[in-house]
Structures are given as C-alpha cells and as structure tokens.
Amino acid sequence: MEKVLVFGHKNPDTDAICSAIAYAELKKELGMNAEPVRLGEISGETQFALDYFKVEGPRFVETVASEVDNVILVDHNERQQSANDIESVRVLEVIDHHRIANFETSDPIYYRCEPVGCTATILNKMYKENGVTIRKEVAGLMLSAIISDSLLFKSPTCTEQDVAAARELAEIAGVDADSYGLEMLKAGADLSGKTMEQLISLDAKEFQMGNAKVEIAQVNAVDTNDVLVHQAELEKVISAVVEEKGLDLFLFVVTDILTNDSVGLAIGKAANVVEKAYNVSLENNTATLKGVVSRKKQIVPVLTEAFQA
C-alpha cells in the first residue's frame, strides 16, 4: 500500500507535532499506510509531552516528493508554511483551525477547518465519528496540543469545545489537565541554552499580508526580561533574516505565561504598522501588547487589516 505522509507546519509547535502523530494513527486504524513526519526541530515544550507520555517524535523531513505522491496537512494550509516541495505532491486532506490563504489544489480534497483553538480538538471529534478508541498515550499528546494552543485555556482562541475535549482527553490519559498543563508550559518557557537563531525560529510563521511579506515568531516565558535582556543579539539575527527573506516586517513576540501580556520586537521597514495596528509607540523597537497572547486571533488579523488599510 502506498505511503502517505502526515505533517504540520514548519517550525512546528506542539499541535503541529502531536496532531500529526494522532491523525496518522487514526488513518492507520482506518486502513491507510500513514506516517507522521515533522518539518522542523521539536521544541522543549513538545519534547516534554513526548517524554511524559513515552512517545517517539516523528522523523524530520524538508522535502516529501522523493518519498510519496500524496500527503495530508494538519495545523496549516498556507504553502509557505509547508514542505519545501509541497507543489510537487498531491494534498489529500487538510485538518486545520487557521485562516485559509495561499492554498489551492487541482483535485477535490477532504478539507476540514473549524473555528476552534486547536487541531487536536477536531481530531478528538474525528476519532469518535469513526468509532476509534484513542490510546492513552495519544490522548496525552492531544491534550498537550490543546493546552499549548490555548495557553492552558486562557487564550481568546480557546472555545468550550477545546475545554471539553481537553477534559475528555485528560481522563483517558490519566492526568490532571491543570497541573500537567502548567508543568508542560513551564518546560516550554525554559529557554536556557537556546541560541538567538533558535529563539526566533522556535515557533515562527510567514504570512502574506496585502503586498507585505511578514514573519511572526512567538516564544513563551515566565519573565519576558529573561528573553529581552538579549535584545541587541536578537535584533542582529532578526535583521539578517529580514534581509535574507526580503521581509517587510519580522515581529518577535515574547508572551508572559503568568500575566498573559506580550512584548513585541518589531524589525523591518514596515515596523510602524505595528504601531498603527495596536495604537502603541515603539520604543527601542519594542512595545508592550497588553492581553495579547494569540498569534492566530490577536496578531495575524490585526496586522493584516493594518497592512490593507
């Protein structure tokens, strides 16, 4: 039987990795030869979840066409966030919870996108719809994805469906969602030992906003100053990325997981758009973004609107 690769976006977060594993397992149960893979390094937060539930991480690939003809995308749809040669393969399915942009296919596909906080929430429904029992370990990973994407249910992207799914999955996994979740988020917020290059690419995504090419990277921290103490070095590596990729804006967002506020470091010729979007003034290229924790709901649409205004 021909193999199908299942993967999330580049610079994968916990949902991208865990939903690839969970959906590949569901597809295998339904008779498909599916293998989860990843398009980037595994973060400390995701590794914590994999270790806790004793699951091996997917192997790393940059290109897919040399291996397979067909792929399934989870947690993304935009071409620039996908495999480097995504144009050379057929996308069979997409399971996602983001905006739909820069995406088209030559054939009809199964496309499931719901306005929930996490791909794993959708997968929880799909397991039920197909009458497949979720293994304890996979339930733990799916729970981890929801906790990560919802910042332990505090993000404005979090819906009642996400909370309900998390409670169900926690029961299957045999953990307390709140205490496990805080432990996992703290593991993800431990940025010690990371290079500046790693920090700005841990969870980074590229977007086309009007005519502007924008990259938004986000890291969680227990104290934003632990990251911003390295601002000069961060600006140096970000400026290099801006030049290399021809970006109009690179916004590096440091989110405090305790206060649920963020600090944005804006580099590029369109940095002033951040000021316009949030009605703030950049001081030394940074601004506090009160109550902003979600790239999907509080950054991407706000910046897109500002660029198009």
Swiss-Prot record:
<keyword id="KW-0464">Manganese</keyword>
<feature type="binding site">
    <location>
        <position position="9"/>
    </location>
    <ligand>
        <name>Mn(2+) 1</name>
    </ligand>
</feature>
<keyword id="KW-0378">Hydrolase</keyword>
<dbReference type="InterPro" id="IPR038763">
    <property type="entry name" value="DHH_sf"/>
</dbReference>
<protein>
    <recommendedName>
        <fullName>Probable manganese-dependent inorganic pyrophosphatase</fullName>
        <ecNumber>3.6.1.1</ecNumber>
    </recommendedName>
</protein>
<dbReference type="InterPro" id="IPR038222">
    <property type="entry name" value="DHHA2_dom_sf"/>
</dbReference>
<dbReference type="GO" id="GO:0004427">
    <property type="term" value="F:inorganic diphosphate phosphatase activity"/>
</dbReference>
<feature type="binding site">
    <location>
        <position position="13"/>
    </location>
    <ligand>
        <name>Mn(2+) 1</name>
    </ligand>
</feature>
<feature type="binding site">
    <location>
        <position position="149"/>
    </location>
    <ligand>
        <name>Mn(2+) 2</name>
    </ligand>
</feature>
<feature type="binding site">
    <location>
        <position position="75"/>
    </location>
    <ligand>
        <name>Mn(2+) 1</name>
    </ligand>
</feature>
<keyword id="KW-0479">Metal-binding</keyword>
<feature type="binding site">
    <location>
        <position position="15"/>
    </location>
    <ligand>
        <name>Mn(2+) 2</name>
    </ligand>
</feature>
<dbReference type="InterPro" id="IPR001667">
    <property type="entry name" value="DDH_dom"/>
</dbReference>
<dbReference type="GO" id="GO:0005737">
    <property type="term" value="C:cytoplasm"/>
</dbReference>
<dbReference type="Pfam" id="PF02833">
    <property type="entry name" value="DHHA2"/>
</dbReference>
<comment type="similarity">
    <text>Belongs to the PPase class C family.</text>
</comment>
<dbReference type="InterPro" id="IPR004097">
    <property type="entry name" value="DHHA2"/>
</dbReference>
<feature type="binding site">
    <location>
        <position position="97"/>
    </location>
    <ligand>
        <name>Mn(2+) 2</name>
    </ligand>
</feature>
<dbReference type="GO" id="GO:0030145">
    <property type="term" value="F:manganese ion binding"/>
</dbReference>
<dbReference type="InterPro" id="IPR022934">
    <property type="entry name" value="Mn-dep_inorganic_PyrPase"/>
</dbReference>
<feature type="binding site">
    <location>
        <position position="75"/>
    </location>
    <ligand>
        <name>Mn(2+) 2</name>
    </ligand>
</feature>
<keyword id="KW-0963">Cytoplasm</keyword>
<dbReference type="Pfam" id="PF01368">
    <property type="entry name" value="DHH"/>
</dbReference>
